[in-house]
């Protein structure tokens, strides 16, 4: 019997009257999968329940932060203790120092770090700092990589490889867009041409070291080192956006996993243990330019707030335990191999990318290595697959171009159930 979403439908109707689009982040509206969203009432471990009582195995994990699973006892107990003392003070606390110390010890390139409240704040602040440090204006980003919703990075490619970017959102002034150059992910040859043309104007390259916002797209062999070499040659900074990959690919993030060191690193998601958080950090000589130590201004009322710091500390302590990342990799591989077999059995052409506990099933015959090949995916097939999986109690990303997240709370039984459901869902997708 198909699940009922009556209460969710009523809530969504009410929400649309008072919240733009009925949601506080666009992907949650489920537009690209052709349905309205269920409203979630609670979660525990690998499961979520909506307001109609439907139960789901959750592979969004709050878009990445819940690497331990929902309501992990260590995080909940730490937060309860913190709440007894207060929520926020607008003053320094030992918790900020503790988490900052943990970050600098974990991430090979980070000598100093500044806490903020979101990944968007982190990347916005890192770009300002890079421009100040280099005394240059232009930024290179990559098509399909998402770094938050601030003006400098809401940019798509222009009509030619070396043209200035143009905004992807109304309200982004063209003079801001003109300082952002959009390149192709995994294309070093194009980057070399860009640097030959305007290298002396480029302040920084910002990149997801493992792309996660066009679906999961790994860096080609030598790509990240090529970025490092180009930045060294032209005195530009290399910024890794590790909001997704930080503490996800390894305890040292993507930079340790791929052994390529950026100048600045942006963080979020996992380091807040499920609470709003962001951070940016890097080499001491660069970070000492941040106010009040230096002239580059950045501030925030709730930056480093006790609750987020507490949840982050508790989460990272769990991730320090032996075997954690091996377990995540094992479970993620078990899921991916099961999905590959289910797709083949259902006669669906699909391409799978997986790195550690991140993966994406693309509905395309092409190997996905950049935005163009990701865009070859059949989004109608994905939508049919998604809806069928949701009906069977499997909660995936409501968009083709997002990651599937595996957590420590997922069990082999969860994965077995997911693979069984996927066979039916792939057959439904094949009819599209």
From Swiss-Prot:
Its cofactor is pyridoxal 5'-phosphate. It comes from the Bacteria. Its EC number is 5.4.3.8. Pathway: Porphyrin-containing compound metabolism; protoporphyrin-IX biosynthesis; 5-aminolevulinate from L-glutamyl-tRNA(Glu): step 2/2. One of its GO terms (biological process) is protoporphyrinogen IX biosynthetic process. It is found in: Cytoplasm. One of its GO terms (molecular function) is glutamate-1-semialdehyde 2,1-aminomutase activity. InterPro entries: 4pyrrol_synth_GluAld_NH2Trfase (IPR004639), Aminotrans_3 (IPR005814), Aminotrans_3_PPA_site (IPR049704), PyrdxlP-dep_Trfase (IPR015424), PyrdxlP-dep_Trfase_major (IPR015421), PyrdxlP-dep_Trfase_small (IPR015422). Pfam families: Aminotran_3 (PF00202). CDD domains: OAT_like. The modification N6-(pyridoxal phosphate)lysine is found at residue 269. Its main location: cytoplasm. It catalyses: (S)-4-amino-5-oxopentanoate = 5-aminolevulinate. HAMAP family: HemL_aminotrans_3. Belongs to the class-III pyridoxal-phosphate-dependent aminotransferase family. HemL subfamily. Homodimer. This is Glutamate-1-semialdehyde 2,1-aminomutase. It comes from Desulforamulus reducens (strain ATCC BAA-1160 / DSM 100696 / MI-1) (Desulfotomaculum reducens). The lineage of its organism: Bacteria, Bacillati, Bacillota, Clostridia, Eubacteriales. The gene is hemL.
């Amino acid at each position: 019997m198909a699940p009922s979403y009556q209460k969710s439908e009523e809530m969504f109707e009410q929400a649309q009257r008072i919240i733009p689009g009925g949601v506080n982040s666009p992907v949650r509206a489920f537009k690209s999968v052709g349905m309205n969203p269920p409203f979630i009432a609670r979660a525990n471990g690998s499961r979520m329940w909506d307001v109609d009582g439907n139960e789901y195995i959750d592979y969004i994990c709050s878009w990445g932060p819940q690497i331990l699973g929902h309501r992990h006892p260590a995080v909940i107990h730490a937060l309860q203790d913190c709440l007894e003392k207060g929520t926020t003070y607008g003053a320094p606390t030992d918790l900020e120092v503790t988490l900052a110390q943990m970050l600098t010890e974990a991430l090979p390139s980070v000598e100093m770090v500044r806490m903020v409240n979101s990944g968007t704040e982190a990347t916005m602040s890192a770009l300002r700092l890079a421009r100040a440090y280099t005394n240059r204006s232009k930024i290179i980003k990559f098509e399909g990589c998402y770094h938050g919703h601030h003006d400098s990075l809401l940019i798509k490619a222009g009509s030619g490889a070396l043209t200035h970017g143009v905004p992807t959102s109304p309200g982004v002034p063209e003079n801001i867009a003109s300082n952002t150059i959009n390149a192709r992910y995994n294309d070093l040859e194009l980057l070399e041409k860009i640097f030959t043309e305007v290298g002396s104007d480029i302040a920084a390259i910002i990149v997801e070291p493992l792309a996660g916002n066009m679906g999961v797209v790994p860096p080609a062999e030598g790509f990240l080192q090529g970025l490092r070499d180009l930045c060294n040659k032209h005195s530009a900074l290399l910024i890794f956006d590790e909001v997704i990959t930080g503490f996800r690919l390894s305890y040292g993030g993507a930079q340790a996993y791929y052994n390529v060191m950026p100048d600045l690193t942006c963080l979020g998601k996992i380091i807040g243990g499920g609470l709003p958080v962001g951070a940016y950090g890097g080499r001491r000589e660069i970070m000492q330019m941040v106010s009040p130590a230096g002239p580059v201004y950045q501030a925030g009322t709730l930056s480093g707030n006790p609750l987020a710091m507490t949840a982050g500390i508790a989460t990272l302590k769990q991730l320090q335990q032996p075997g954690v990342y091996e377990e995540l990799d094992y479970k993620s591989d078990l899921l991916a191999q099961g999905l590959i077999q289910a797709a083949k059995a259902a006669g669906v052409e699909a391409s799978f990318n997986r790195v550690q506990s991140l993966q994406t099933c693309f509905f395309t015959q092409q190997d996905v290595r950049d935005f163009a090949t990701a865009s070859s995916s059949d989004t109608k097939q994905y939508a049919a697959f998604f809806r069928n999986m949701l009906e069977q109690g499997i909660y995936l990303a409501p968009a083709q171009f997002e990651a599937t997240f595996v957590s420590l709370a997922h069990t082999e039984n969860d994965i077995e159930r997911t693979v069984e459901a996927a066979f039916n869902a792939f057959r439904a997708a094949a009819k599209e």
